Amino acid sequence: MVDNKLSQYVQKQLDNRDKTGLVNYLLYENGKIVINKKNYNDVIKKNKNVLRSNSIGKSMISYVIGHAVCEGYIDSVNVKLDDWIVLNDTLYADNTLLQVLNMTSGDEDYIGETKFNDDGLFNGERNKQVNRRTVAESMLWFKGTKKKKENSRYNYNAMSTGVAINYAIHKVGKDYEKLLKKIFADHVGIKDTFHFMKVSWSPKDVVKGSQRYSFFATSEDYLRIAKTIMNDYHSDSCIGDYLRFIYDNRIKKKLKDYPRRTNYQSAAATYEYGGQIHFSYKGMKDRVIFAMDGFAGQQMIIDMDNKRILIVNSIDQHYNWNKIVYKVIKN
């Protein structure tokens, strides 16, 4: 472990947790952990140090889908989603899996940050939150909808993610829990508990699309996941091909269209997006950096070029993102 100016500043941010919200900071580079500091509150300790990812879970969803493709459950990410009855007569049935993964579903008139100041409200209505309903229930609002155009613009929203993972679960079927174990327990080597959130834990609701994207794991297991993704990216393997494919097929966000909605103190303030992952930081557009971002300051950043990983967890985002995240990755 290092004890430098960065480490000391991070400690001050952690000590001032009630103001900064920072609870965990882990920096991995040159094949070892160089900073590993935490200041958990009683709620986190009570939950066995498991940390909620929020929208970092969207990126975990993509990783699961990549494995589902590699295991042969899904032909490719270019398949149309019109073979899942839940999506019938909605714009999502007219999309490919890659299009929903890239947030280019053509749904901006109905949901998402392009038109509405939220990622999960249908038509911007507070009583129509897609994150609280199964995909089947949410699709009742989308009946008769058509996507904007074939090559639609980036529109960040929770519905595309929900459609993507629950379509994958539909294709994997009864093997889904076995697939999760194969990915996270066997391949990644997770040591502690982990799980995705669901809107319903009833087995009968699985066919309706009940899984959400929020993911829970310990800091140490987030590092294991990030290291595995980094190693996969550099490997001659199917999942490596998938990770390189989503990077090669990333799309431009056009952030100027989001001036009031983008959190510029987060990984969301990047210029490109692909496969539920943010790419292309300002000043780092020529570097391959997988930037994963979650509400309230959650960050998992994998610098593929320099083999550096940064994991940040917080209960609210008032920490100095520019100093302990952006500048660390840029240097």
Residue ranges, per PLM feature:
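Active-site-proximal loop and beta-strand segments within enzyme catalytic domains
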Residues: 15, 44-60, 68-153
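Catalytic-site signature segments of enzymes, centered on catalytic residues
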Residues: 35, 47-48, 113-201, 210-213
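Alpha-helical scaffold elements that line and support the substrate/ligand-binding pocket
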Residues: 31, 53-74, 100, 154-184, ...
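Active-site Gly/Thr loop motif
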Residues: 191-197, 249-309
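Carbohydrate-binding/catalytic loop surfaces
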Residues: 121-124, 199-216, 263-267, 273-278
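A short, well-structured edge-of-sheet supersecondary motif
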Residues: 12-45, 300-302, 307-311
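Active-site helix/loop module of the DD-peptidase/beta-lactamase fold
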Residues: 71-110, 159, 172-213, 217, ...
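Short, gly/Ser/Thr-rich active-site loops of penicillin-recognizing serine hydrolases
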Residues: 320-331
